[in-house]
């Protein structure tokens, strides 16, 4: 799954009208929107997804939900836009495994890679030092293969993501 983010021009004192505290925010949608202010008072706003190999017009894709949250930014210039591909698991929980003797693996951070990869590294370091308990606890979380095998994986993924995105748009 591809996800995108934009940064506005510095907002100066107007930034306090958006967020009065230095917090990161995420909504409850399935196709989640998330935002925070940067050190120089730019709004960093992420959202939107795509499921293929080509990225859409990122500014257009992310501006729509950003302006739904903050319509007062309609005339604000977006100075940066970028995106990336995320590994998403079926249950959106990371996948910790031991694929072989003396081999540890962690992946599928579902958009939370900065925090989860840091945790995974710590748990892998502990496990490498013989303290397996916390790594094994994460490895015990149930993981499910995406249904449909090779032939149906992409069609089912696109159908499911379109369905959940439509539910978000309809407010269901």
Role assignments for model-derived ranges:
Residues 1-13, 17-101:
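Active-site substrate-recognition segment that forms the wall
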